[in-house]
């Protein structure tokens, strides 16, 4: 047994609890729909790693079902993931298993790419099977991989009002699939009013997250990577009214509208350089059926009415082939000290920022809409 103890703790003198149960609340089969879990303390699970290419276990999760409500719980001390909205196997159970058996001999990432091709082009899934969950007002912390994880099963879900912190701290693991929230194919999901901090990466939207709305969230101290990472997605995705305070705020692919955000960290994005560029899926609107694949060229980003401060600027783009639009954004002079500070008090968190120059003067600005 390999163990890591807090500094100053001698396991020969202290009491040591070893968690061996793989999950706390997790069905033993798929398709158990419309379950509500409310008001519990759920803790101490030896969960396995949750990749998108195999079963994705969590301390709690629907295991490929529809319409769960998980709210007002404390979810903590999961070896890997807190809440899993992911799949129960590679592919989606009865669909994927109906395909003829085959051995995937492609080297490196080619194996996973071919599996994904088979899965999406020959074994798609529908809204009747999974998704449409409500994950609300939970405190999720001290998980080794992710606070919330899910491939496909998070589609059409509402994730709101959660406090997610201290995820993947202490360098227990390294690699991919680690974040406060990590979702693949989260079509039409809404992530709003969450508070995500002290994680290896705040929010990671990966392959196929189409129609996602990320609104009204507070991110800070996610300083190993970024507050928000959107990887090889084609959009449309909306990122609006968020407060992004970490050193690196945004790393974006394409097809994204960023509106009314306070951005204090670096802003980057551009052409996908992984494995020489990838062809990734896009879908019929508000659906689950792939209608094609396209390269991720970078760009097609729209920036409206954002406030950029401290490290934030629009100067770092990596070969964006698609056009970008900028209008109504305000950038603070890097020489000015806005003293942006997040203060924790007994009744909540407060944002403090010093107004500089002529910011307090009235100024007429053109109304910008998407109409």
Question: Which residues does each predicted region cover?
Answer:
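Glycine- and acidic/polar-rich repeat regions and solenoidal domains
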Residues: 25, 47-63, 79-371
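Parallel beta-helix/beta-solenoid
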Residues: 2-15, 20-22, 26-48, 66-76, ...
